[in-house]
Amino acid sequence: MEPGDAARPGSGRATGAPPPRLLLLPLLLGWGLRVAAAASASSSGAAAEDSSAMEELATEKEAEESHRQDSVSLLTFILLLTLTILTIWLFKHRRVRFLHETGLAMIYGLIVGVILRYGTPATSGRDKSLSCTQEDRAFSTLLVNVSGKFFEYTLKGEISPGKINSVEQNDMLRKVTFDPEVFFNILLPPIIFHAGYSLKKRHFFRNLGSILAYAFLGTAVSCFIIGNLMYGVVKLMKIMGQLSDKFYYTDCLFFGAIISATDPVTVLAIFNELHADVDLYALLFGESVLNDAVAIVLSSSIVAYQPAGLNTHAFDAAAFFKSVGIFLGIFSGSFTMGAVTGVNANVTKFTKLHCFPLLETALFFLMSWSTFLLAEACGFTGVVAVLFCGITQAHYTYNNLSVESRSRTKQLFEVLHFLAENFIFSYMGLALFTFQKHVFSPIFIIGAFVAIFLGRAAHIYPLSFFLNLGRRHKIGWNFQHMMMFSGLRGAMAFALAIRDTASYARQMMFTTTLLIVFFTVWIIGGGTTPMLSWLNIRVGVEEPSEEDQNEHHWQYFRVGVDPDQDPPPNNDSFQVLQGDGPDSARGNRTKQESAWIFRLWYSFDHNYLKPILTHSGPPLTTTLPAWCGLLARCLTSPQVYDNQEPLREEDSDFILTEGDLTLTYGDSTVTANGSSSSHTASTSLEGSRRTKSSSEEVLERDLGMGDQKVSSRGTRLVFPLEDNA
């Protein structure tokens, strides 16, 4: 190395290790990258938080909008009912009879449906079709993963491939479309219960045999005739290429069952207003009440029809008889459940609830409504159960209620019945434009109109002919024509049709049922008054009041009789009074005793059930054996002895009091106040004109069975004849 090189001390440092500033550069670069990454993460986190906040805000806005639409939809129906009520008042004031309130409610529903369909904007871009070829069936609940978030969807029904692009996009129309279960669980129970609770038992039981024949046999005949005719129509539609999906024979029978449910509410309202013949009213009302129950059980039995083998829609004898057994089981089970749950009279009998009318009315309401839900929960039919619950409540529980609760319960269910029925008919008009799955088939609709006409004719005329063979008071041709004309369809047929609209066949049935209801309510209902005049059916028939009946002269009449049969001479000692009034020519004739099973039931009800369940009837200490004395004293209420004021049920029950009736069992005579004496087995009615009530009404109210009057064997009712002087 040269000497000059040693004189440069910095040259060795430059060529050896790097300078310290260069060493800091990677550190500064790493630190900068970390700061940049942190800043980027912070900004992305803030963006995510902002996005989440925006999603929550959008969700809250959707919930608020949904709540607003719910309020608007309910307000729409309330305004419909309000407008209907005001128009009804105007019609009644002007005595307009060509249009009933139910038809009016349907018209208003149609108008609102048109406004909602064509006057409210649709919301687009919120529906999307997704394909899932890995599954071979639909699920009731579906969880969908959208960007890591799971959303729950529920099944609403099947949509045909041709209508995928026409799915309803209007949220408002979706809001006014109710779940069908709302009709069954909320709206139908008060309608059916009111029919049973307000039943006029006098005329109903006087025509009970005919009513049962029309309701059971007639509905079955109508169902099978309509079903077979519609099956022919379906075959014709297949030949003509007018049927785009499956439509089986069981579907036709199901349609026959639901469309056989009559609802002559318009006709009955006009009958009641014009005071038409009471027997005709009883036949139509009784048939419609029981007919609804039969139709719903019959439809359930048809749905349960499952033949063995691959072809599940072919006829199979074993499956047929199994369906018949299901029909009998469901109907009898529902009847039993309704009657048993309706016998809650002991709750009102052995408690002091009558001191608190509000609690008494509330308990009565809840126990009555729970009958429907209990029957449905147990696999029976709530319609049948709540119907017979209403009849049982009216026969037993009503007598135990306080005066205020009686008025409250009748008015409560009357108001609920009115509102529910008009709500359903308003919804019918609305559904013509808001329902999303209508299937209009002209051939099917025309065939259905022809089928229900022929089914009604085969229902009324042949049965009336056979019934007249055993009836003393024949069902005249004018009555038969009026019953044929009065086969309106209404709330029950609509509720059964809308309950299942998942398949193509059921959607076609629903649309056709809706049009049939419109036609029968508007056209047939509007023609009721002219038809009454054309058929020369009596109107303005006023039932004799109790005071008028008390003026009649009384004479002996046989107990436990069938008013429809001719009387052979008989020396039986069962007798009650028959009035010598305007119908004395008919009433004075002796009549043959009814079947022994009815006599046993009447006697059992009067002597045991009424005293056990109500404050009515003879004390159990006089009807039960001596060894049951303790039980009899426990079940007999003090009101049986010391009740000074008669508790009356309108047109059904009568609770005996002192001065009205003295009951004799064996050698012991027991008056209503509990006093007794020993004499022969007789029963005497006492009191002056001030305290005397119609003897026919007494027994009729006590038994709740109308003109079929019964007394237990070995007991006579002795009534003093009034002096003609």
UniProtKB/Swiss-Prot annotation:
Compartments, record wording: Golgi apparatus, trans-Golgi network membrane; Recycling endosome membrane; Cell membrane
The keyword Protease belongs to this UniProt entry's keyword annotation: no
Gene3D superfamilies in UniProt: 6.10.140.1330
Known outcome of mutating residue 515 to F: In MRX108; probable gain-of-function variant; affects the regulation of trans-Golgi network/post-Golgi pH homeostasis, causing alkalinization of these compartments compared to wild-type, hence affecting its own glycosylation and that of exported cargo proteins; no effect on subcellular location in the Golgi apparatus and plasma membrane
Topological domain ranges for the Cytoplasmic compartment: 1-21, 92-95, 197-210, 273-277, 344-349, 392-414, 464-474, 535-725
Glycosylation sites per record: 145
Comp. bias regions, Low complexity: 675-684
Catalytic activity: Na(+)(in) + H(+)(out) = Na(+)(out) + H(+)(in); K(+)(in) + H(+)(out) = K(+)(out) + H(+)(in)
Biased segments, Basic and acidic residues type: 687-704
Regulation: Inhibited by benzamil and quinine but not by amiloride.
Swiss-Prot/TrEMBL GO biological process terms: monoatomic ion transport; potassium ion transmembrane transport; regulation of Golgi lumen acidification; regulation of intracellular pH; regulation of pH; sodium ion import across plasma membrane
Membrane-crossing residue ranges in chain numbering: 22-42, 71-91, 96-116, 176-196, 211-231, 252-272, 278-298, 323-343, 350-370, 371-391, 415-435, 443-463, 475-497, 514-534
Lumenal topological intervals: 43-70, 117-175, 232-251, 299-322, 436-442, 498-513
Mod. after translation: N-glycosylated.
Span of the signal peptide: none
Membrane topology summary: Multi-pass membrane protein
Chain intervals for the UniProt region annotation (Disordered): 1-20, 567-590, 669-714
Gene Ontology cellular component terms for the protein in this record: Golgi membrane; intracellular membrane-bounded organelle; membrane; plasma membrane; recycling endosome; recycling endosome membrane; trans-Golgi network
Entry-linked InterPro entries: Cation/H_exchanger_CPA1, Cation/H_exchanger_TM, NaH_exchanger, NHE-6/7/9
Region (Required for trans-Golgi network localization): 533-559, 563-568
Database matches in NCBIfam families: b_cpa1 (TIGR00840)
Disease implicated: Intellectual developmental disorder, X-linked 108: A form of intellectual disability, a disorder characterized by significantly below average general intellectual functioning associated with impairments in adaptive behavior and manifested during the developmental period. Intellectual deficiency is the only primary symptom of non-syndromic X-linked forms, while syndromic forms present with associated physical, neurological and/or psychiatric manifestations.
Protein name listed in UniProt: Sodium/hydrogen exchanger 7
Species name: Homo sapiens (Human)
